[in-house]
Amino acid sequence: MSSLRLTFWGAAGQVTGSMHLLEAAGARILLDGGLFQGHRAESHRLNVQLPFDARRIDAVVLSHAHIDHSGRLPLLVKEGFHGPIYATPATRDLSAVMLADAANIQEKDHEYLERKGRVAPESEPLYSLRDAIAVQDLMVGVPYRRVFHVRKHLALDFLDAGHILGSASVDLRVSENGNHRLVYSGDIGRSGLPIVRDPEPPTGPIDTLIVESTYANRQHESFDQAETRLAEAVRRVASRGGKLLIPAFAVGRAQELIYSLHRLSRAGQIPQIPIYLDSPLAVDITTVFRMHPEVFDRAERFIVTTNELFDFPLLHYVRDVSESKALNSRNGPAVIIAASGMAESGRILHHLAHGIGDHRNLVLFVGFQAEHTLGRRIESGQERVRFLGQEHERRAEVESITGYSAHADRDELRAWVRRLGGPIRRAFVVHGEPPALEAMAAILREEGVRDVRVPSHGESFEL
């Protein structure tokens, strides 16, 4: 067999920045091209320069549209990449919106800090809107369960990862001078979540497995428990006239929250207070969701019996900046859902700046908060937090709900591995903080995988 090499250029020893370089069948294939997030100076250092010549990459396989998996694709194009980017149709449509938004946020944040005289190297935009738009010209939509030849001896199959709309596990088969099967899990979702279908793992013998580990050392509450706690949070904030501030990923999490609040409102389980989705990106993403009902979970009764999942009387979509600003001076209780999910950018920063000092308010986290992010600092209970160039005293209540996580927990990851069925020759564990990486490695060994590695950044392996 010709040489097979795998190099880990992101999400190795940490959660963000997913990017893995596969050299096979005479081609150089990039599995994801994600942005590092968190500690700004360190992330900027890792993001600003690609560790290879972009012009020598033949193709990209994109597992899903989250920025920590797709956010460096415009930089790749900026640096000279012009090959195909393979993704599911829903991922293609989501990334069109999300990458343009990422470019806009970088440019606007830089302009804001420039006006304030607080420009730092890490605030320089990585790429422009033009670069983000150029990515879409290279996108090739590949439906689930349709084998597609990336090269003559390299076949690709996408299976539903159940993580977000369009997310996929990648099944790659190299047939040059022999056979080698590589499976990249992407981000594995949970069973029983609304809207998207349950994860569908590839089955049969696997030579090389690359698997995520985000929550391999944790156990989530159920979705029903999460909805109950969400209802309690809404009622508690309403009773004291405060605001429920929810940093939420614009794709997936925002729509799941709308789904839950719709169900709770219809069932009379929450007070009739206004709910604002204050994120132009999330509004656009919701439009993309409406475009792809073919990937919804038709086993979910509320989906089947509801004509319009994403519209109900309490819900208001906010696009206009002036309307967003007006929410901060609005009297009375309200729910405000805004991106970004880790409170690193977007309108949630301005809502936190105005609301984190008010004891009536509640900051509710419904997703993973990576190390060094503002979300992690608030979630961990810091009484003083610095963002937008100023220090803020936290008086607002803080709570976290894990049941909305789009990542499989310990037991769900173990079940996913078991459902693979066939023997696994070797496995690489990525996309986790050190305790989770080690927990996932232990799960794999317990399930009979003898060769388990936890690669470090830049580490390369002959397969």
Would you name each region that the model predicts?
Residues 12-17, 24-83, 87-137, 188-199, ...:
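Pre-active-site segment of Zn-dependent metallo-hydrolases
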Residues 31-33, 57-66, 73, 85-88, ...:
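Active-site neighborhood of phospho(di)ester-bond hydrolases with catalytic His/Asp-centered motifs
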Residues 94, 169, 191-278, 362-367, ...:
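Cap/insert and terminal regions of metallo-dependent hydrolase folds
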Residues 102-164, 293-332:
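Metallo-beta-lactamase
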Residues 230-371, 445:
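Hard-cation-handling environments
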